[in-house]
A protein has these predicted regions:
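A conserved mid-protein helix/loop that constitutes part of the nucleotide-sugar donor-binding site
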Residues: 17-18, 214-237, 249-252
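Donor nucleotide-sugar binding/catalytic pocket of nucleotide-sugar-dependent glycosyltransferases
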Residues: 131-206
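Nucleotide-activated donor-binding/catalytic signature segment of Leloir-type glycosyltransferases, i.e.
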Residues: 253-273
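Short alpha-helical donor nucleotide-sugar binding micro-motif in glycosyltransferases
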Residues: 269-270, 277-282
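Short alpha-helical segment that forms part of, or immediately flanks, the ligand-binding pocket
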Residues: 276, 299-304, 318-319, 325
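Short hydrophobic beta-strand element within catalytic cores of glycosyltransferases
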Residues: 308-311
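Conserved acidic donor-binding segment of nucleotide-sugar-dependent glycosyltransferases
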Residues: 323-324, 328-335, 344-350
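A charged, aromatic-enriched C-terminal amphipathic alpha-helix characteristic of glycosyltransferases
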Residues: 351-382
Length: 387
């Protein structure tokens, strides 16, 4: 089977980039595979990319040429915004190739792509059918009226052009994503039957056996949607220690909190081995996202390393973290709830914490290994090709 993967890299690396790279490496072991990548630029080049994203003839030509040469059975699209634009879907479909779209955000539901605005959930775009004028008025994308409008217009234009209906299969990484796309209104009107769930995966490289310390750990992008403000406010008034690792727009706020509160420490941006080590010695990892997190690769990384989780109770964390099994939940964005759960966790005996750790590895092996993922992907591809 011949498979062509297409992805537009973000300016700041994120989870979607990792998903693309991991699945590319995974599929290399299962058939002939090629990839086409684009890069989102900043400045005037980025502005031109953004404007041309409604119908990017250059990207279309690049994809068309690869399909002529490679003759793939499947084209799988990851991120199309904004370097390639959705036109690549039309090109593949018109050349007779089965098209799969990997949905790792909510851009087809709302121009915010996160259903979050000013630190709060913004669901107007999925509660009302039609063009998302309220989202445009509120400037939910980069606080820009024009950019929000244009992104919404690109999605709406391709609805009118029939692009979204040309996709043979949409893959959602969690039931949360599938539910938001299939049970709520949207201005794309994608048929429900085209969605299925296939979780992302992590690569387990062996578990480090370390004596766990008493501090908590946060690893991830230092940004609004990850609940950084709420997390810092909780630990500013807590006696427990917190180590924060990552990078992002709220890094300065994290450094300021570290300077003022000795129980909060910043570890910087860690490589894979350092992440593994950090997860092996903390008492638990805190996943504090305040939005409908589509998946959360750091959760599967924690599970693979036997690191219990204390997670918010909406989005994919509500699915991936099983209460009382491999972690516990707190009410999203609620400082008192998080503090109560921190107290609960620290009052557990060591044997009980070890049970959680053992269950983490069991959960990972059951659901999130590369082998499971390869099996699921190939099953999807074969089903499409055979039909």
């Amino acid at each position: 089977m011949r498979i062509l993967l297409i992805h537009s890299y973000y300016q700041q690396r994120g989870g979607e980039d990792s998903v693309f790279e991991q699945e590319y490496e995974l599929l290399k072991q299962s058939g002939e595979i090629r990839k086409i990548t684009f890069k989102n630029h900043s400045g005037w080049r980025g502005a031109l990319q953004f404007i041309y994203s409604v119908w990017n003839t250059r990207a279309a030509g690049k994809v068309r040429q690869m399909i002529y040469e490679f003759k793939p059975d499947i084209v799988q699209v990851y991120n199309w915004n904004y370097a390639s634009g959705p036109v690549i879907i039309q090109i593949a479909k018109k050349l007779g190739v089965k098209v799969v779209v990997n949905v790792q955000n909510y851009r087809l539901l709302c121009p915010s792509a996160s259903l979050l605005h000013n630190g709060k959930l913004f669901t107007d775009s999925i509660e009302k059918r039609g063009f998302p004028w309220k989202a445009v008025r509120y400037r939910v994308y980069r606080n820009s009226f024009f950019q929000t409008f244009w992104l919404a217009f690109v999605v709406y234009f391709h609805k009118i052009a029939g692009t979204w209906e040309m996709v043979d299969q949409y893959i959602a990484p969690s039931n949360t994503v599938k539910k938001l796309f299939t049970e709520y209104k949207s201005y794309t009107d994608i048929p429900k039957e085209k969605f299925l769930v296939k979780p992302n995966f992590s690569i387990q490289t062996g578990i480090l056996i370390r004596k766990r310390e008493k501090h908590f750990l946060f690893i991830g992008r230092l940004s609004e949607e990850k609940g950084i403000d709420f997390l810092l406010d909780t630990f500013k008034n807590s006696s427990y220690d917190l180590i924060i690792a990552g990078n992002g727009p709220l890094k300065d706020k994290v450094l300021e909190a570290c300077a003022q509160h000795s129980n909060i420490r910043f570890a910087g941006n860690l490589d894979k081995e350092k992440v593994k080590e950090a997860m092996s010695i903390c008492t638990a990892l805190i996943f504090s996202s305040i939005w409908y997190e589509p998946f959360g690769l750091v959760i599967t990384e924690a599970l693979s390393n036997g690191c219990p989780l204390i997670a918010s109770d909406i989005g994919s964390p509500a699915e991936l973290v099983a209460e009382g099994v491999n972690g516990i939940h707190f009410k999203t964005g609620d400082k008192e709830s998080l503090q109560n759960r921190l107290d609960y966790w620290q009052n557990l005996g060591e044997a009980e914490k070890e049970r959680y750790s053992f269950n983490c590895v069991s959960s990972f092996n059951e659901l999130f290994t590369p082998e499971k993922n390869r099996e699921q992907l190939l099953s999807i591809y074969h089903s499409l090709v055979n039909n």
